[in-house]
A protein has these predicted regions:
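Ribonuclease/tRNase effector modules and their secretory precursors
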Residues: 1-79
């Protein structure tokens, strides 16, 4: 799973509303949440699962949902 997502990091994106949700839900000060998400995905301690049409990237504190066909970051939240 992780290899697929890593191979397609250049396709990772979100909508304007998704950007606002990520910044709010994860308390990000990062101007570009997609850039932050790319770094999060690349961390060795993150895990990835695939359920139905989404990838779920997570560690002990954060979960990101990413559409598996469009690579759109749908939402992120703290556990």
């Amino acid at each position: 799973m992780k290899e697929i997502l890593l191979a397609n990091l250049d396709k990772l994106h979100t909508t304007d509303l998704g950007k606002v949700r990520l910044q709010k839900n994860l308390l990000l000060r990062e101007e570009n949440p997609v850039l932050w998400a790319k770094g999060f995905i690349q961390r060795s301690e993150t895990k990835i699962s695939h359920k139905e049409k989404n990838f779920y990237v997570f560690d002990n504190y954060i979960v990101l949902a990413i559409n598996a066909s469009s690579y759109t970051i749908i939402i992120g939240h703290k556990e």
